[in-house]
Amino acid sequence: MTNTTVLNKAADNIRILAASIVEKAKSGHPGGAMGGADFVNTLFAEFLVYDPSDPKWINRDRFFLDPGHMSPMLYSVLALTGKFTLDELKQFRQWGSPTPGHPEVDVMRGIENTSGPLGQGHTMAVGAAIAERFLVARFGDWMAHKTYAFISDGGIQEEISQGAGRIAGYLGLSLIHISEPTRLQLIS
């Protein structure tokens, strides 16, 4: 199998897991999670620098999920890396579950931020990139790492997100934003 074939199959597994856990919970948003599967799989498989045996490694790259309702995508890719079990995924959105509807920070399991209101994850990513800039200035290039953020078109519309984006651009931060614009808000 080619590397592309493996990546595509892994992304399909993320889609299947994401849709399955939302269906089992009878609650959640499967669309965004399924749409972001290719991105998150490629990020974790090809670009994100981290040490699974040392989740708090100071030089790890950071990934911030702004739209918390896309948590099925994050939980699914983390399950493929061994951070969540299938039984834990089946508890999605249940009271006291390790997989709530919006992720809560748990660096040991690969979750860098608690996702709440849209724009919050975006601003946390900007803050992490500012911290990375400080660490490099203070301790040297060996502290350099990348910060990634997945932001939604709805999140970009939030003023807090717009302000964070302006600051990030002004400071020229080592920050990579990924957005999958649907040009569509939640429809009922």
Residue ranges and their predicted role:
Residues 1-8:
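Basic/polar N-terminal segments that are highly enriched at the extreme N-terminus
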Residues 2, 23-24, 111-112:
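Short coil/turn segments at secondary-structure junctions
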Residues 11-27, 179:
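N-terminal capping segment at the start of a domain
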Residues 17, 38, 185:
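Active-site phosphate/pyrophosphate-handling residues
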Residues 30-33:
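Conserved phosphate/pyrophosphate-binding and hydrolysis machinery centered on Walker-type P-loop NTPases
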Residues 35-171:
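Cofactor-binding active-site loop characterized by glycine-rich and histidine/acidic residues
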Residues 176-188:
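Single conserved hydrophobic/aromatic residue that forms the stacking wall/gate
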